[in-house]
Amino acid sequence: RCHDNKYDPIPARDYYQMLSTFTTTTRMNVDVWPDKVTSAITTKKAKDKDTPPQKDATRMMICGEGYDPIVMHTQGWPFFDKTYFLKRGSTDMKDGEAQQGFMQALSTPGDAKRWQWQPPAGAKFSGRRRTLSNWITDVDHGAGALLARVIVNRLWQHHFGTGIVATPNDFGKTGTPPTQPELLDWLAGRLIANGWQLKPLHRLILSSQAYRQSTQRSAEKEAADPAN
């Protein structure tokens, strides 16, 4: 946010361009709590209301200067309609408006409009999130190849306990290199070839010789491969 990534080729400008995708997103509170939870909260609020006030806290609220209300954070509205590049992450140092863009390290040089999606006339949404999804799943020019590897690694971790990349949240320089890069690439290719369907990949992993090996421990096996 305030400077370029020190380890991976991710400049701060990429951050703000990605951030602009969600600038116009409207956040709303949705009532999805069941009656049982709502009743418990109401009871707790009534109990708190009957609790004698804390003198020190009350004095602080009455006499203190306090802070200006932050409507954006408490109510989720209104929102900024623009995103700006900020020097050193400071809101006092705007460096021009940031248009929607994506990570340069995961994009081939060229016109970014290849991912752009225009909503129909009269639509009440910008289409930015659809554009983002087009870039994320583009295996030829966007982040699709990395996305496939990340998904495959998560599935492998789910079934084996540890991913082919032991740091599933970090595929960068500070993460752990894959133990079997060829296998990771091959499985990612299978995922893409199957139209991003996860079920065939689950079936493939579960029917593999690696998964069907015995998990019984012995001193001889532990000495040969203590990390397994």
Give the location of each predicted region.
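Primarily short, surface-exposed interaction patches in extracytoplasmic proteins
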Residues: D8-P9, V37-N228
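Sequence context surrounding c-type heme c attachment/ligation sites in exported
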Residues: R1-T43
